Amino acid sequence: MSKLLNKVFNFVGWEAVDEDEYEYDEQELNTKEEVKDEPIQTHFFNGSKKQQSGKVVNIHTGNQFKMIVSQPNTFDDAQDICDHLKNKKPVVINLEGIEKQDAQRIIDFLSGSVYALDGSIQKVSCDIFVIAPNNVDVSGDLKDELRNKTVFPWAK
């Protein structure tokens, strides 16, 4: 029967291994190596050596923070302001000298844009607003004062 299996294995490309080819010394199998009870030493590396290499990072990079100041004349300028917000740039808008209806439409459009972009809008004075994207935090006493007066109840 083993000859038949050997022929099948040879045909398939496998080699049949006879167990008789391996001879073990009985003495080697019966002897056990002595195991020493030594504590295992573990070494952890947290990468702190590389962090302490003293790298110098230039804080004056080519990307500077830009704030846009805009004085829209018509409702069509509101889309340009919204594009600045989409590019993560805060905008100060001055609505002085524009008709009240157009100013209200611009603020309504920008308020919706700010909400959609998860930004914030703050009133600085009667006709001046700061509109900031979500990566800019606007803080100050005036913000808290305006929130208490509920000028913009949806403001953060």
UniProtKB/Swiss-Prot annotation:
GO CC list: cytoplasm
Single Gene Ontology BP annotation: division septum assembly
Keywords: Cell cycle, Cell division, Cytoplasm, Septation
Transmembrane regions: none
Locations listed in the record: Cytoplasm
Domain of life: Bacteria
SUBUNIT field: Homodimer. Interacts with FtsZ.
Homology family: Belongs to the SepF family.
Purpose of the protein: Cell division protein that is part of the divisome complex and is recruited early to the Z-ring. Probably stimulates Z-ring formation, perhaps through the cross-linking of FtsZ protofilaments. Its function overlaps with FtsA.
Entry-linked HAMAP family: SepF
Official protein name in the record: Cell division protein SepF
Organism: Ruminiclostridium cellulolyticum (strain ATCC 35319 / DSM 5812 / JCM 6584 / H10)
